[in-house]
Amino acid sequence: MKITRLAVVALMGFAGLLLSGCGEEAPESTGPPPPAPAEYADKHMPAGWWADEKILAEGKEIFEGVKNIDVNCASCHGKDGKPVKAGARDFRKGERMKQYSDSVWFWRISEGVPNTKMKAWKSKLS
């Protein structure tokens, strides 16, 4: 099974949200997130990844910057999902985070989020 780093990071971010961009919290919108554009609409996590300990462990290493020092989600979002940088989304807000589909995770991690500090990561994750 080919594991793409982007998929693992998206999975790790989402898994962290279910289980549970300095200092101040980002304002949270109350409506549902926008749908992913067409080029991301068919992006989904492979079957079985949500329960695969090896995949989750690799995702954790990517999320925390262990596998690649140029990619460290936790530097903004915190190791436990609590933001450590201004403007970072609080991943501990499970009800909000459950609204994000796999395709939205792929899109936002790949392309970043306009008008925020969340940059595009697709050049660092494949």
Feature roles, as predicted:
Residues 1-9:
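Bacterial N-terminal signal peptides that target proteins for export
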Residues 18-21:
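C-terminal motif of bacterial Sec signal peptides marking the signal peptidase cleavage site
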Residues 23-25, 84-93, 108-126:
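Axial heme c-ligation environment in periplasmic c-type cytochrome domains
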Residues 27-65:
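Electrostatic cytochrome c docking/interface patches
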Residues 50-52, 74-110:
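Gly/Gly-Pro-rich "capping" loops immediately C-terminal to redox-active cysteine motifs
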Residues 54, 58-61, 100-104, 120:
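Extracytoplasmic/secreted proteins, especially bacterial periplasmic and envelope-associated proteins
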Residues 59, 68-79:
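The canonical Cys-X-X-Cys-His
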Residues 64-68, 95-98, 121-125:
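Flexible gly/pro/ser-rich segments immediately N-terminal to CXXCH heme-c attachment motifs
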